[in-house]
Regions:
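Sec/Tat signal peptide C-region and signal peptidase I cleavage site
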Residues: 16-20
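N-terminal edge beta-strand
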Residues: 21-51
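Non-cytosolic beta-sheet module surface loops
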Residues: 56-58, 101
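N-terminal post-signal-peptidase region of extra-cytosolic proteins
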Residues: 34-43, 68-70, 80, 84
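Extracellular/periplasmic metallocenter environments
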Residues: 23-24, 77-114
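Histidine- and aromatic-enriched segments that form or immediately flank copper-ligand environments
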Residues: 59-81, 109
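Bacterial N-terminal signal peptides
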Residues: 5-15
Length: 114
């Protein structure tokens, strides 16, 4: 339920903001109660033309990848470290997010609104 409200707040914030701007998002690698490693939140939202700044935080001891291929994002975050990644959301659509090192661990999406 918390994810729903977070996603809704992000959609409302993105869709009601004016022209493209800067979007700052924090994404954390966590382990679910079912012992599944995921990046949260699993859905990210931006507007076409936004400059997106991601702060990737890996709370595990193992390294994990984070890839949004449509925007040339392909990073490895070492265990216990964080990494800042910046890109421009220059096209609208729904784009997959995955861990290119452990694809079974991570599934997500970046939604870029027109």
């Amino acid at each position: 339920m918390r994810r729903f409200w977070l996603a809704l707040a992000l959609v409302v914030g993105v869709s009601t903001s004016g022209p493209a701007g800067e979007v700052n998002l924090t994404v954390v690698n966590v382990v679910t109660p079912q012992d599944v490693k995921i990046w949260e939140p699993t859905s990210l939202f931006a507007k076409k033309g936004d400059s997106v700044m991601l702060k990737l935080i890996n709370r595990h001891q193992d390294e994990h990848g984070y890839e949004v291929a449509a925007f040339g994002v392909k990073e490895v975050v070492e265990g216990g470290k964080s990494k800042d990644v910046k890109f421009t959301a220059d096209k609208a659509g729904i784009f997959p997010i995955k861990c290119h090192l452990h694809p079974a661990h991570v599934v997500g999406q970046l939604v870029v609104l027109e």
